[in-house]
Amino acid sequence: MNGRIRQNQTAYNPYSTSGRNNRNTINSERDESENGSLLMNGSSSPPNNQQTNKAGFFKNMVSKLLSKPLQWMFSNFDESSSSSSSSSSSYDDGNNIPQKGSSTTTTNINNNNNNNNSNSNSNSNNNTNNQNNNSNNNNNNNNKINISDDYDSNLSKVKVPSGINFDTSSLSVADLTRSYQTNISNKNILDNKPILKKDQNPTTTTTTTTAAAVPKKSVAIGGVTNNDKKPTTTTTATTSILKTNINSLYPNLSQDRINANASTFNSSRNIKNNLSPTQTTLKITNNNTIYSNSQFKKKPISSTFNASPFESSIINSSSILSKRKQFDDNNNSNINDNQSIYNRQSIYSPNSKIEQPPLKKRLPNADGTDNSVMMATSQAAKRILEHLDSFSNPVLAHYNPSSTMAPSSQSLYNGNDSTYQPPTSVYRPKIKIPQISINYKYNPYGLSKLLEKKPKSNKDLGLEIPTNSITSSVSLYKKPLNKKSEDESTEPIKTYATPSTTTTTATVANTSSSSSSSSSSSSSSSSSSSSSSSSSSLFSSKPATISSNTTTTTTTSSPPSSSLFSTTSSAASTNTATASSLFSATPATTIATSSPSTSTSTSSSSSGNEKKLDNMFTSDSNKSNLFSKENDGGGVNPFKNLATTVSKTDFIGINGVSTSTSSSTSTSKSSPIAKKDITSINKSAPYEKKKRGLENEDTPLDVPGLKNIEPPSGLFNFSGIKPIETTLFSVSTTTPLATTTTASSSSSSSLFSSPPTTDKSSADKSSADKSSTDKSTSPVTTSIPSFTSSSTSTSLFGPTTTTTDKDSKTASIFSTKPTTEGLFSKPTTSLTSSSLFSSTITTATTTPSIFGDASKSSTSTSLFGSSNTTTAKPPASFGVNLSAAPKKSSPPPPPESDEEDEENEGDEGDEEGDENGELEAEEAFYVPPDSDEENEGDGNGGDLEAEEEFYVPPDSDEEKEKEKKPKTKQQSTQLTGLFAAPPKGGSLFGNTPTGGSLFGSAPTGSSLFSGGSLLTSSFLTKKGENDDDSSDEDSNKKRKKKRESSSSSSTSSNIIIPTTSKKEKIDDKPSTTTTTTTTSLFGSTTTSGLFSNPSTTSTGSLFSSNPLGSTASTSSLFGASTLASTATTTATPTTSLFGSTTPSSSSSSSSSSSSTTSTTTPSNSLFGTSSSSSSTSSSLFGSTTSATTPSSLFGTTTTSSDSKSETKTTPSLSSGGLFSTTSASPFSIPSSTSSSGLFGSTNQTESKVATTTTTAATTATPSTSLFGSTTTPSTSSSTSSLTTTPSTGLFGASSSTTPSTGLFGSATTPSTGLFGASSSSSSSSISSSSTTSTTTTPSTGLFGSTTPSTGLFGSTTTAATTTPSTGLFGSTPSSTTSTTTTPPNGLFGSTTPSTALFGTSTPATTSTLTTSTSTTPSTGLFGSSSSIATTTPSTGLFGSTSSSTTNTAPSTGLFGSTTTSTTATPFGSSSSTPSTGLFGSSSSSTSSSLSSSSTTATQPTGLFGSTAPSTGLFGSTTATNPSTGLFGSTTTTSTTTTPSTGLFGSSSSTPSSTGLFGSSSSTTSSTTTPSTGLFGSAAPSTSSPFSIPTSSTPATSNPFGSNPFPTSSPTTVSSTPSSNPFGAPSLSNSTSSSSLFGAPTTSTAATTTPSFGSSPFGAPSSTSSTPFGASPFGAPTSTSSPPFGAPTSASSTPFGAPQISTSSSTNLFGGASSSTAAPSFVSSPFGAPITSSSSSSSSSLPFGAPTTSSSSSTPFGASPFGNSMASTTSPFGAPAASPSPFGIQAASPSPFGAPAASPSPFGSTPSTAPNPFGNFGAVPANGFSLGKMGTSKKPAKKK
């Protein structure tokens, strides 16, 4: 599906049998359980503070699943089109007119055919959120069209509030003065033809704007609001059909009211609207103008009949459209805030002296002037509402006013935006409101009469222009939510008081079985297992209350969508509202420009009245919560959101200019950045040069506020932290990635951020700078993703480099000081660690690194080579120095012109000071090729020209580099690197002493990755004040700029900011050379490159460890392994990303004994863990095998250590680990009490000693973790306990008796998880009989549940289930005793014939495939591979591979049905009734002979025809009546009397057809008239190029025709098949041809089934192995292996729901079974697996709910996101004892997990276990290495 499901747009359902355009039918029930329908309204609007692409892994993964559900299947989805695509995301099946703009095709996945499913499922689970209750009956009705903000060229100046949605799905009335055509009017839809007349040629301009729309509360999976996509609102403005269509559409309109002659709308339009200037200005105010000043009509306007049959006083008195709550315009809050009222006063004001509001207003321009665009007001919509009263009255027959009693204390849209005063709530009764669309066929004048009515009070008010459609107006009235528990009240739905009512239907789970039912799509719902007032539902949240004293901004308000994935509402208000969601961070303040929008914010954080979030991931002031930590007080929160200041930051572009101001309450002195940095940011941008004409387009460079930038210091978080806070994914209150508030703290450690703390000496220096304006009181918050230094901060990605204060420790992974413990810095302690790309340093002379070790020996062995660094001064800049290498023989540079000065203006300030690590932002990785490289032909610099493909940016002029070339002659030693070049060479990876190679690292070289280049870290470091003197060659201007921008010297490594650094001259001051040792990305010479191994005085490189003699143990990116330590062992381990640099505690331990080394300090690496049992690991995923509990993310021990590196291990279960066993950690694994860990609670031991036997207490309540709760066994056996309450985790709960509402469903009981639930099992053993469940209610998981569910991918139906699932991919076949009578209608079908998208694989009642008695095939998209005895084929898209002999009706699939039979016809089976598939159906035939098929009378009308004559597109193959297909029909016998009139004619019959290309007339003499096709006809004697060859012309290869069927015997069959691309192929005796659509024959025998040779689209026969049947999209037969079809037996279809098979297959989505006893999902990534006691071990599904077998190693159940069992291998689940990549497993081989002794690619297992990454992780004991490094020497200090 090209594009994604945009906001308010429903997914396409190919099986909506109720009609895809009949919105009256589809939308007639806008009531309960809209959450039950999956992917219907995945709202794609991002929160205002969320960059779309800044999301993390899980959010990206899930949001792509939810918002672009099938783009990986159907189209070459361009990610860039996510914000600009105007294509409709509806799958056009020919019924819908192709719609430009944001067309809404209202379909329902939950098909009405499955009403019986919901009836049998409605009341069976009281504890589950009955999301599938009536889910099949209730279609999602949020039919809103996002009308673009710029339907006119004037709208570029219009302040239209972003996200205004006009729902014109039912009715699109053109603006009579403007006639912009939103999509297609109803008349067009009903008539299926455009309005345009023949002579019209409208220019249609489709403009797409992305606005920070208000996030809608919409139904996503299980109610997950997916608010991370910008809404793409598209308007197709048709500007030339107005003057010709206004009169035809509205014949009664007078021309004086409409200037129909104006083709474009301009301000000179003469409209007699008599509107005052204030009335014509569109105002977004807090007044309830949308409900006020409306005229009240006593009786509804009748549409077509005089007296409305419903105009009784009783009905009118309770009309839901005319009677509404009265609002007080003077009071902006709801009347009777704490009292439930259903005020029967009309929503309309009385028809009184109040001035009628205008029906249209002028939109204001951005500058405040009136725009020429007129916009219909809500008054026009109210007219339609009044008109529709008669339509809506009948629904009140069973109306109970008590059901609408709701207080106004809560509302659906709890917008926290300061502009959003609490609007008036509209109570809608909990009744069904019919969706009324004015049907021009049946109501041709009703709307026109309505529009032509003038207001009663004001004749001259002007023409009423109802822009809002009737549907949106009706859906404006929200019905109240369902009743909560006793202390909770029903929320009224708040609607935005804007002309475009943001309407989202808050559905109510219409359940009577449980009072705690959850409506996942509504803003608040009861928890499924408690009746407390805290709405702790997984996907819904408790709405936030808005304080009324908020600051008014113009940002669109984001209501707190407290759902699973939604972040909290962005509120400019400091009274941050509460919202609870799984990923809900703290109330993020409005980041005005975090997304492209026109909103601005001037919020102030002076009051600091912030309320606490109240769901399981956020907590009160003293609790540790998952994503937020409120106060300075207790709790270590990994995912803390630092909401201490409310700061408004503008997103900083590459030019680095921040235009925002901030009022911060932080008292910490922000670390000022020297002007040098700002100028380098602004002026070094390659496109900021005057040569490019862009110099003056942005903010002036010397903005005083910018001198005081507090740089962000962390990948995910930046400053703004007052307390010492340890956060995992901490984000500042200003959510944008590159945003930081201006606050710093003395010490704080977070996993992904380290709040920068200004070093006092550095701060004093920089404030003492000459031209510095650091005294600015309001530091501008900057969004530059750079890293500043802090004194003591430990963060994962926060490379807080230490400042000149050498005592400060910054344990960040990117830190590069020798004293720091950065992840990407290398340890400086000798023999204490090795890095990813360099192995153990065993001697003082060899530090081998595969990516180059810039050691000082001339024989350093590196992958990219390393240069001799003995005479080289280390380039002090960690940026890419991309200018050519300086050479001694370089001529003096020509004097710089002014253009050059401007061009290198940012560089000039840096050139003298680069030795101190000055970093320039001039280069992005894209390098503009505008430099003056004059010595490009030289051997050293020749290969770094700007012409190279690597985008080598010219640093500046080549001559400037050559000015700074060291005068000393470089030592030309031969390098021994893998790609090393000769000393003078300029090879790609070669390194000469003077550099010049791409990856070379010359001492002063200018190679791409050499040490003062690509990723210099000196951007935000302060430069020494003695740097001001520059070389004499420098101009005074440069020297002046340098003084202005010099900053104090420090060392910092930065990986994010690509900058260019100039090489210093040799004769610079010594202070610049001695104080800086910066790290380049891919290695410098003596400085530590990314892959190089620096000298002892150098800072750590990214991937290598420090050489010998170092004093600090800073490990590199992938960890330093345990090194034999002959030097002093540091007590503090290095913090490597994937490995733990576990320093040996023994001073004499060798590298071979690293597996027995005991360290006293755990490593703080991301995935690493310490390798010893006595040590603790605080790594992200690592845990140890020791009795202690590491305080890692998934660890199980607590490591308390102070800044002095003194570590104290606390072996308690209340650790700070992510999955610690106490409820103190949100990720903790529950012990006796169920904690709500992020990844569920795994089976953890109560004892202090971790044993292999997991003995955990029985948790009565599962944790509501992110991925569900892993079941806590009640016994010591990890496979015998089932919790009684499922968790509502993200991916559901693993097996428990009660289904959870997890994202992936729950185990054992059908849950409503995203991927369904794994099968329920009645036995206590997980590995034993898991198919004996008698669960009768399927789960509604995304991928279905084991029980038939309505999951996305169907459900794996368990035995004896009576209701199949309606999952996306259908449900997999139930086991051998299945008595399923109703097929599921999953996307890919189900085992029972379902209406799945891709059909279903029909079940077998026995273990064999040939005895199935399923009677109804599925109507999947690709048909269903129905079972053997099915009597009705499926109507899949590609037909159904219906079963054999007893099929009576073929399917009507897209490509027909391959209905098998006793005959072997080219298209499949002999069924009594052919199907009407797209490509026709294989004709039914009663004989088994190919040459003598006696087809039945009824022929299918497939696209390509059918075997029987049909009216297919390409005709049909033969029968008595030819088809009229596009390409005609390949008729066979001479008895055919009527040829087809296909596009390409028909293959012969007695009268030839008149196809486009004529008809290939038959060979019989009875054909008297050849066809008069475009290319003529193939007369019997002639062969037209396009005709279908006859038996007389067998060798003819027509493009479109095909050989007809043999008329007599197989011997007369043509020996050569035609290779026609489109036609139906002939049955030939030779090999198959490769026709595009046709199906060539493959056999020589007449009785064999012809195959679809290589036909991508045709529907194959049962014995073929063709792509389309076993076709990628067709429903394959039992022996085929199609990608998409649902295979029957041994096939390996990727998508279809697999058939129970005797052999295992590898389906992408389906689950093929591997045994006859019980089906299993063999390797289906997405399908929900079947629970099997025998073959479930071979299943490895990424997404499906896992099987309950303990031996199964499925990724997704034991799934990466599912709730894995205790012993399964789950990438993402956190099972207690499973080898899980991301789990917390201690002793398992896991790719990313950090088991203590496992061969982990990224783990830090230093043991002798085989390590896939070899030296990357902890090196093996033998010290694996790629080579030897030369002797390491100290870099020569130059003077």
UniProtKB/Swiss-Prot annotation:
GO terms for cellular component: nuclear pore cytoplasmic filaments. It holds the Pfam family Nucleoporin_FG. Residues 896-923, 944-958 have a biased composition (Acidic residues). Residues 1-54, 78-150, 325-367, 480-568, 589-636, 657-705, 739-810, 818-837, 846-1106, 1129-1839 are annotated as: Disordered. Residues 80-90, 102-148, 329-343, 495-568, 589-607, 658-671, 739-760, 774-803, 827-837, 846-871, 1005-1021, 1046-1060, 1071-1092, 1129-1242, 1250-1292, 1311-1384, 1397-1498, 1522-1673, 1712-1810 have a biased composition (Low complexity). One of its GO terms (molecular function) is structural constituent of nuclear pore. It comes from the Eukaryota. Residues 761-773, 1061-1070 have a biased composition (Basic and acidic residues). One of its GO terms (biological process) is protein import into nucleus. Residues 1-27, 35-54, 91-101, 344-354, 616-628, 1093-1106, 1293-1310, 1507-1521, 1676-1708 have a biased composition (Polar residues). This is Nuclear pore complex protein DDB_G0274915. It comes from Dictyostelium discoideum (Social amoeba).
